[in-house]
Amino acid sequence: MSLQKSKTRFGAVVMKRWSRKLNRIIARTAAVFLAFLAIFAYNTNNAKAESVNVSAASAIVLEASTGRVLYEKNAYEKMPMASTTKVMTALVALDYGNLNDVVTVSKNASGVEGSSIWLSAGEKMTLSDMLYGLMLASGNDAAVAIAEHVGGSLDGFVELMNKKAQEIGAYNTHFANPNGLPAEGHYTTAFDLALICARAMQNENFCEIVKTQYKTLPWEGHEWDRVVKNKNKILWNYEGGNGIKTGYTKEAGKCLTAAAQRDSMQLVSVVLSAPDMFNDCMALMDYGFENYKNRVIMEAGEYIGDVTVEDGTEDRFSVYTDKDIMYPLTDTEYEQIKRRVHLEEKVKAPVSMGQLVGTIDLWLGENRLYSVELKAAYQIGKNSYEFNLNRLLKFWMNGRMLDM
């Protein structure tokens, strides 16, 4: 063997030994915060069997951010929903329309029966103002004008409504019009409608509209403006009330979707065919706030474990959570939360940013609440001769400087 080859081989052995030592030193301080994705399946099995005194034929209250059902009564029975339909009308309009668009009222829209904001054929109004007229005063004329503008036609808009219902998971809902007037094939369930409302309450523009008590709207051809008042008494009469929509037809009876937020918990309640609809929704939300709290079941910065890296520029990295996970629980349930961690013991370099390295499942009894994906927050490269040489030189230089 030549002298040059011998030196090269000796250098490689030294590099490898020093590299292992350096990897161990560096790994003691290397910590990777992992991005995680919480996958939540709607859980309706834990709704309390206790009775809440409501007049409604169908009722439900759920926590909006998780979709957890806190109480329900006949919540999966298909029923007409009157003007609570307009929650979906507004949501679709916000998804597909532009708030600054100018809507021209058709003769068809101006002639719709029932509650209205007194639109005239040919009148022009921004989509934003039209939505206030829809959700505060429950204008059937506004519903048709919005639908024709955003969907191109009533049929086109209704198709978008039904598509959105499927996206949300409201599988037992079907719309036949944008205003909720009686029609064949127009129905929902209290559960589905609560899901729709929960989704709508995630939209900032929607929330701003439905929490408004009074709104002044322009009125073409008149010396004064329209002033519309929100029909939802929850805004005045219930602590934290912040939405959302009333409804009534002879066929559907009195219907109400109501929302309230206290601290970090946003509740949505729905009652269908409810003679005492406001008191019903307040009783449902009272039950939710009195029995449940939105609790942190996994905190940001919690240490989960270590993952070994084979042939990497680092020997291992530590796994931490990077955000809080909250869930509505009773005091008793909070003590029953269990975790099941599934973490890779070893991964081979290179490690890509976002690479899946494990999961955490959070359980309440036999119900899995969340499955959290643990992903590498940054890249870890593959070991190489050049990398080891550079690290050895830096380590050697640092050592010499300390000796000086």
Describe the function of each predicted region.
Residues 1, 20, 24, 44-47, ...:
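Short linear motifs in intrinsically disordered/low-complexity regions
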Residues 3-5, 16, 41-204, 208-209, ...:
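Active-site-adjacent loops and short helices of periplasmic peptidoglycan-processing enzymes
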Residues 23-46:
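Sec-dependent N-terminal signal peptides of Gram-positive bacterial secreted proteins and lipoproteins
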Residues 13, 19-22, 35, 47, ...:
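A generic local structural motif
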Residues 18-26, 127, 385:
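Structural motif marking the loop-to-transmembrane transition
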Residues 21, 25-31, 53, 57, ...:
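Generic hydrophobic-segment detector
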Residues 170-171, 182-187, 191-404:
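Domain-terminus/edge residues, biased toward the C-terminal soluble/receptor-binding domains
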Residues 1-23:
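N-terminal secretory signal peptides that target proteins for export/translocation
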